Structures are given as structure tokens and as C-alpha cells.
Amino acid sequence: MSEDMEVTNWGYTHISVKEFCYVWTIRNFSPCIDGIRRTITSPVFSLEANDEVTWCLIAHPNGVDEVSECYMSVFLELLSCRKSPVWAKYEFWITTSQGEKYQCMKSFNVHSFQKNQYRGFKKFILGDFLISHPRRFLPENKLTLCCKVSIVGSVFGMPGQNITPAIKDPRHLLTDDLGELWENSLFTDCCLLVAGHEFRAHKAILAARSPVFRAMFEHEMEERLGNPTEIHDLDPKVFKEMMGFIYTGKAPHLQSHSMATDVLTAADKYGLEGLKVLCEDALCRNLSVENAAQTLILADLHKREQLKTQALYFIALHASVVSETSEWKSMMETHPHLVG
């Protein structure tokens, strides 16, 4: 196409894709690999609680035929649907005792599923290999099999002339502007002293966002006006992350467990509920064998129920290795009620 050719017509097509992951724990798995061909079926599951499209997983610990008798076979079966066929991709893997993905196998194409039709892998993993590595794959004799399903739904096409150009969300403009006030210390009216570092800020913004700052400024002695307000027990990096959230509603540096932990403590102290939610989400995503016990204590201390639930689930899933850590043993001495 010539670069100077005028575009007179255009359009776009949107393909709806819904994804979800199902985790299936099979207890007392070892006796299933005994040379006898048997079928294990998971509970019925769906994308949403009332979804009319329902599925189940099928496992054959000793394969489905002579070709696959040394392997474990796994399949995804469509049990019910309002309209057939259902088009979907699928991906299977085993979750190890360390919480890692292993033997990830996926369909490279979108497949058509009719009711009661199943698809998957005859030769998923060697049965003897699973049995010979029980600490890694069968902690407490439990196999954790995961399946990610991507359902391809409706296809929508629309001509370009019917599309209203996207307008930038004005809330983003506001947070960008407020962030600039903070980053460049523009028109500030107070000074906060944190571990010897001075930070210029705006009383009105701090008071509007944090009830603790509001009370602090309301009761500030008149003779202290104009003098720095000292902030105790906060690291400057943690304080900057908290202040960035106060001005912009964002906290982009919560990837590390230690930072998210310290920022959660600060957010709780200064009554920043939105920041507590961001920290809780980051800590849920960063759960590991090493920090699970510490995270459970933290969740209980700051009354974060979602984080507490996720930590308990993670610990239950990896009990054999978590229970060997020094953090777990320490927690059992100081906070035994958390798992009682």
C-alpha cells in the first residue's frame, strides 16, 4: 500500500477468550500405579459458579492402552454446555512440592469439544518417574495436577466509523499531576523528617488520604508550625513508596517480599486501606516455602483475611517441606494458634 494513500474504511475484530485454572489434588496416589488400568475423575468444575459449561479432569495412572501403559494419561472432558461445540485450548502440568510447574504440556491449537468429548495426552508422564521422586512430586502421597483452560467465545467485528476514539481516563491525568507535585516538591507547605532525610509535602493531600496524618496536623502545636514533623520507625524507601501511593494511588515497587511486608506495616499504621490491599495482593503472589510461615504471622497481625487464607492453603499444599523450615518451627513456638 502506498504511504500517501488515504484510508477511507477500517474496522476491528475482537475475539472473546476466557481463561481459568483448575487445581486437582489426588490423595493416596502411589497405590494407583500398580499396573491395573483404572480411571480417576475429578470433581465437576466450571469457569464461574453458575456457568452452564462444566468440565472434569480424567487421569489414568497406568495409561489407556498398551502404547501408554507405562505413562500416566490425562484428559479434559466437557460434561455440559448450552451450545456446542465449545472451542478451547488446554494446558496440563504438575505442581511440585516447591510450588514449581513441571511437565507442562499444552495443545497448540484451539480444539472443538462436543458434550462428553475429552482431549488430552496419553503419554503425559512416566509413572515410575513419579514414584521414584516422591518428595518432589508426591509430598504426603498427594499428586497436584493443574489444568489451564482457555475458552474461545464470541467474535465481534465493527466498522471503524462506528467507533468512538478512546478518551484518556481523567483520573489518570489527576494522579499524574498530583504525582508531579510530590516528585518535584512543588508548592509544599510541610516538611517530614524520616531517619535524617527531609521530604517536602502537602498537608491537605496527606490529611485527605490518611486519618493519621489528619489527626497529626490537627493537633500540631502552634509553636511547632514551620518545623519538620518527625516520622518514626520508617525506612526512607518504605516512606517514599507509601507517599507515592498517597499521591497517585500506585505502589510499583512491591515485588520483593521484604518491601511488601514493610509497606504493609506502614500502611496499617497510617490507615491506608487501598495500599494494604495492594500489599496483600503482592504477598499472595510471592508466597514461597521459605516465607509462608512469616507471611501467615503477618496476615494475622494486620488482620488480612485473604492473605491468611492463601498462606494457610499454600502451607497445606507444601506441608512436608514448609514444616522443615526454621521459620515454621519458630512460628509453632510463638504462634501455635494460627494452625491449631
UniProtKB/Swiss-Prot annotation:
InterPro entries named in the record: BTB/POZ_dom, MATH/TRAF_dom, SKP1/BTB/POZ_sf, TRAF-like
SMART domains on file: BTB (SM00225)
Domain BTB: 188-255
Family: Belongs to the Tdpoz family.
Gene3D superfamilies assigned to the protein according to its UniProt record, in alphabetical order: 6.10.250.3030, 6.20.250.50, Apoptosis, Tumor Necrosis Factor Receptor Associated Protein 2, Chain A (2.60.210.10), Potassium Channel Kv1.1, Chain A (3.30.710.10)
Protein known as: TD and POZ domain-containing protein 5
Gene: Tdpoz5
A Gene Ontology BP annotation from the UniProt entry: protein catabolic process
Domain MATH, residue spans: 19-149
Annotated SUPFAM superfamilies: POZ domain, TRAF domain-like
